């Protein structure tokens, strides 16, 4: 009897915990960065790619941005939002100047509003140069399973 009660309690605990585990997801984030995606578009052969992950349980965003053919060294880089394609927005996540040489690697823990905007596709990443201080290459961030 006691053993059956223990097994029943264990089964109930697993059943109740399973939906919580299922709700957490590791998502892939990506963006193709081009000069044509800047607002307004820029004249540059620069291009790049963002790859990374977003953990919905810890709210941690990890990124790797690789770029090349800019008009000069990167002077700044940021995640911006919320903004749809073709619109500009303020900085959501700054990237330290010491991390600017390609590849740019980093991580940040997002707030609830930041997570909402990221998952809605309302963030973009851009890389700035001295010739293009408003941004030389840009890409809209998508989060997918």
Question: What annotation goes with each model-predicted range?
Answer:
Residues 2-5, 14, 19-77, 81-145:
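Metal-centered catalytic cores of metalloenzymes
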Residues 9-10:
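Ser/Thr/Pro-rich, acidic low-complexity intrinsically disordered regulatory segments
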């Amino acid at each position: 009897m006691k053993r059956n009660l223990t097994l029943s309690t264990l089964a109930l605990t697993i059943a109740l915990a399973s939906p919580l585990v299922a709700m957490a997801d590791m998502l892939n984030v990506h963006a193709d960065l081009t000069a044509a995606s800047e607002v307004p578009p820029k004249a540059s052969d620069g291009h790049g790619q963002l790859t990374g992950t977003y953990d919905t349980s810890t709210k941690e965003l990890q990124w790797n941005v690789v770029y090349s053919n800019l008009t000069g060294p990167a002077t700044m880089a940021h995640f911006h939002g919320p903004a749809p394609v073709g619109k500009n927005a303020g900085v959501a996540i700054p990237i330290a100047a010491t991390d600017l040489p390609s590849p740019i690697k980093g991580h940040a823990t997002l707030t609830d509003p930041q997570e909402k905007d990221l998952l809605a596709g309302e963030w973009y990443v851009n890389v700035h140069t001295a010739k293009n201080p408003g941004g030389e290459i840009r890409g809209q961030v998508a989060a997918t399973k």
